Amino acid sequence: MELRVERTTLRFRTPLRTSYGEVAARDLFSVELHGGGVVGRGEAAPLEPYDGVPAAAVAEALALYAELLRGFSADVPGHLLLDACRTAVELPEALAAVDLALWDRAGKRAGRPVAALLRDDHLDAVPVNATIGALNRAGAAAAATLAAAAGYACVKLKVGTGDDAGRVAAVRAALGPTVALRLDANGAWDVETAVRMIEALAPAGLELVEEPVHGVAAVREVRARVATRVSIDETADEPGALTAAVADAVCLKIGRCGGIGGLLSQAALVRATGADVYLASTMDGPLGIAAAVHAAAALRVDLACGLATLGHLEGVVVPEALRVVDGTIRVPEGPGLGV
């Protein structure tokens, strides 16, 4: 087997501003897995300010995987190839690239979309949310107006960056009463601030508040003190978080989970606690978004997923198969990942 790796740097159309800082560009690793006349494609999308994973670490891991995979023939089962890579270097963001390539290859060999390999009765389309960053009131309201006009049924607003009450009010006024409003603090608040802010903002009609604070113990306390639903994102990385029944919902990401297989396993753990699952990207490229759509379809998610993010990247043409229509992305119909 031959693993080919290409690294590119992509700039954001406008810098990504959240409570953890401003990011102007991201590294993306595209991989091709060659063997048996079929090429599987995948990607690794580390975002160090968010996940703490340096691009250099991913590059090193992928180089080791490439060297390792040369020793395997094309008829070796995919799970054994992935296990071998994991044994060499267990770095989820790098493993995700191999996992995606293996699923893409399997789908192409079977002539079926990945979602169909995972589940016969998968969703045909996955609900997605629009995301509004740390814009001022006028900018946030304008973005909300565009999102509502485009048919999004859910909008996520980044908070914890100042003037939250004014921005939330402006966005709700622009959206009207029927579009769900989700807030994401990226852990910017402490417990007391989170409780105070959530209670103050709740009259705007909140679907849920994502990652109001960091850490299982802190999230548990906030959830116990507010009526609004609370979800975790970054805290999902904390040991034991997925089984702690600490939140009403958990946001899972392809890269952080090590690919589709890892994400499905983690989703099962979360659902066993009674919590909901939804997916989001870390500003992934087209292959990462496609993989997440297939996984979300197989999971039959109800909550809108944060996968409408390709438009934030300069130089990336959104594939027709991944275009957002009326707040949903249809499952790509082509074999494999379908893009």
PLM feature spans:
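N-terminal small/glycine-rich loop or linker at the start of catalytic domains
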Residues: 109-134, 167-178
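Conserved, mostly hydrophobic/aromatic
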Residues: 31, 37, 98, 111, ...
